[in-house]
């Protein structure tokens, strides 16, 4: 009985604090907010597919919407013009990243590039990535790796002998092997411990800490084993990357060409005023692997899904690729430049299916006025790239349809200058690996449609294959894509 009384008074007290916080301390007009519940605010409205739930809410409350996730104010952005105002007009004010228990435990206490706080360390690490890891010269240097792995993929598909096969698994294997060779120097694919490790990491990145939003419920994270999972995952990741770095140091790899070799060279050179630490090498390598592998796999899986659902688009793409590469056994990266419809297909797949529909959160470092709204320092900001890509005001009444043709007569691109297409972000925090991802995605997709005629298995033809999504930070198909590929005789 006494416990019930204590619990009741605790709830009443926390409710009073919640209402007091909501009604006081406002310096100006705030963006519209859906009604929340005491203590948890709007947490209950996120849903399994957060990007879809927030898109529905934004249609009612507007493209700039303020949620209260427990005690944390989060600004949700669902339109291109508001994204531009934040990522261009007020880019510096929103360039910070919020710290979280998850990023601290899994990303080396935010020593990577993606989650590092905005400041001198982040600027130095981004400079290392842009100059030494992801420059056009470095991207070109890995051409042989891409070509070799694509050749292996094509041979694997031919072995299916025109029977239904798991396209998703083949694409995941390809992107994993390419990124492993580029970043780590060799493959770590198949059913290895590393594969299990990365699968666990992907699952954890799609979760969140209840205690981070509602501190007095932090014990729930401990009870459900979330804290223990983070600790074990962080240790397992560090054990793996420490061994990889040590193997590189022990070998005679001063002329090595993978990304860890490049980072170790930077460490040895000890530039004046800057020295890269060992923990930073591991953190940046983890960034490259997680971002590069997951992004490319997700895009290719959805691109093939949409092409199989839209045979006319598939036929048009095949006609373009086979015309340009007439008489060739495969598509090379030199052939890609003139393939306008291929590039349109990639853009349309990214528009409808951005690999990370809710972009990594930003955080304001100062008070900002957005339109007529006051945004206090410390407010988190999340861009709903999925909603922006389906905005009717930008894309028209057919915004939900897969139509690559919409990109043929427009200069809209995904490299951060056009805010209606934001799969890689924009501004200071844009993904620095855009060029690497684009080259891989284009040449893989071109070879798939050049080398094979594709169709859905008979059992999938009625619904033209489903487009159900998985849940998590990156959004794949919920179920693997199966298809039939028949070798095309050139």
From Swiss-Prot:
EC number: 1.14.-.-
Cofactor: heme
GO molecular function, one term: oxidoreductase activity, acting on paired donors, with incorporation or reduction of molecular oxygen
Transmembrane regions: 1-21
Subcellular location field: Membrane
Keyword entries, A-Z: Heme, Iron, Membrane, Metal-binding, Monooxygenase, Oxidoreductase, Transmembrane, Transmembrane helix
Topological category with respect to the lipid bilayer: Single-pass membrane protein
Leading EC class: oxidoreductase
Any one annotated GO CC term: Golgi cis cisterna
Highest taxon, organism lineage: Eukaryota
Pfam families: p450
Keyword Hydrolase in record: no
List of residues binding heme: 431
Similarity section: Belongs to the cytochrome P450 family.
Name of the protein this chain belongs to: Cytochrome P450 71A25
Source organism (scientific name): Arabidopsis thaliana
Top-level taxonomy: Eukaryota, Viridiplantae, Streptophyta, Embryophyta, Tracheophyta
């Amino acid at each position: 009985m006494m416990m019930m009384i204590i619990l009741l008074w605790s709830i009443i007290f926390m409710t009073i604090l919640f209402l007091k916080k909501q009604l006081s301390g406002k310096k100006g007009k705030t963006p519209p907010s859906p009604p929340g519940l005491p203590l948890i605010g709007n947490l209950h409205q996120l849903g399994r597919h957060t990007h879809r739930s927030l898109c529905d809410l934004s249609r009612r409350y507007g493209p700039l919407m303020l949620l209260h996730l427990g005690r944390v104010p989060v600004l949700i952005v669902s339109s291109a013009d508001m994204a531009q105002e934040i990522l261009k007009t007020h880019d510096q004010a929103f360039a910070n990243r919020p710290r979280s228990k998850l990023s601290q435990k899994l990303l080396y206490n935010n020593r990577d590039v993606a989650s590092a706080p905005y400041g001198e360390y982040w600027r130095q690490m981004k400079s290392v990535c842009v100059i030494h890891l992801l420059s056009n010269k470095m991207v070109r240097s890995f051409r042989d790796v891409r070509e070799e792995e694509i050749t292996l993929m094509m041979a694997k598909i031919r072995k299916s002998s025109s029977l239904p096969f798991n396209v998703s698994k083949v694409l995941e294997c390809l992107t994993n092997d390419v990124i492993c060779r580029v970043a780590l120097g060799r493959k770590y694919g198949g059913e290895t411990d590393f594969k299990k490790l990365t699968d666990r990491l992907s699952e954890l990145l799609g979760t969140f800490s209840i205690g981070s939003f509602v501190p007095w419920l932090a014990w729930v994270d401990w009870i459900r084993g979330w804290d223990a999972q983070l600790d074990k995952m962080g240790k397992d990741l560090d054990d793996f990357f420490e061994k990889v770095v040590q193997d590189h140091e022990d070998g005679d790899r001063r002329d090595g060409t993978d990304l860890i070799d490049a980072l170790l060279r930077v460490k040895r050179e000890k530039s004046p005023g800057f020295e890269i630490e060992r923990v930073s090498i591991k953190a940046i390598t983890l960034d490259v692997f997680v971002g590069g592998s997951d992004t490319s796999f997700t895009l290719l899986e959805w691109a093939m899904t949409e092409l199989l659902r839209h045979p006319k688009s598939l036929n048009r793409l095949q006609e373009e690729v086979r015309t340009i590469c007439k008489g060739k056994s495969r598509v090379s990266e030199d052939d890609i430049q003139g393939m306008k419809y291929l590039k349109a297909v990639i853009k349309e797949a990214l528009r409808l299916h951005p690999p990370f529909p809710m972009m990594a959160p930003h955080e304001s470092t100062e008070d900002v006025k957005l339109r007529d709204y006051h945004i206090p320092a410390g407010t988190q900001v999340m861009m709903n790239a999925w909603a922006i890509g389906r905005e009717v005001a930008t894309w028209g009444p057919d915004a939900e349809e897969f139509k690559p043709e919409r990109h043929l007569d427009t200069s809209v691109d995904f490299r951060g200058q056009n805010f209606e297409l934001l799969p890689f972000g924009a501004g200071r925090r844009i993904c620095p690996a855009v060029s690497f991802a684009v080259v891989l995605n284009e040449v893989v997709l071109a070879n798939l449609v050049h080398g094979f005629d594709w169709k859905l298995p008979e059992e999938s033809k009625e619904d033209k294959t489903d487009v159900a999504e998985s849940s998590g930070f990156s959004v794949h198909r919920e179920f693997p894509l199966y298809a039939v590929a028949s070798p095309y005789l050139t």
